[in-house]
Amino acid sequence: SASIASVHQALDAGVNWIDTAAIYGHGHAERVVGKAIQDRRDDVLIATKCGRVWEGESREIGKSLRRESVHREVDVSLQRLGIDCIDLYQIHWPEPDEEIEEGWGAVAELVEAGKIRYAGVSNFNMEQLKRIQPIHPVTSLQPPYSMLRREVEEEILPYCRENQIGIVAYSPMQAGLLTGRFSKERVQNLTA
């Protein structure tokens, strides 16, 4: 397929990082990545995420950081990706808030079990990072970060630097806005 060919082309060009999530295409993205890397596993680091779930035919998206859900999600992601260990496994969103510690504890168990190498989080604020850090070290934080979204610079980046937490920014081109492909008129129409 064109998607697999694109992944191969990226790997051939030296890209060595693929960041996906179970929720992207209801698992389809992980399956495509799995097919694309089946003969090239040593060439790439794989990151995927948990915490967004769907069930049944409706495919309505739910949120769960319950221990059982996180364990089930990693097993399904490993199967879809066709690998035995995920390089970076991240909690996608800190929701529901009251399940953050339970979910992070489950992720720590997955590190101990050898199903994931490193554990990270996405979209967590400072207070949430401080709540989970004592449970298990946070390897990385994936916040939105671009020239237009710089709020992480005030508290989050210094905290991460101090605690040796890597930053894996998402949306650095602000969903395409900073690519130069948006005219002044098009931007004005977005806010209208």
Q: What name fits each language-model region?
A:
Residues 1, 56-71, 93-98:
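Active-site mouth loops of central-metabolism enzymes
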Residues 1-45:
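N-terminal binding-site loop/beta-alpha segment at the start of enzyme catalytic domains
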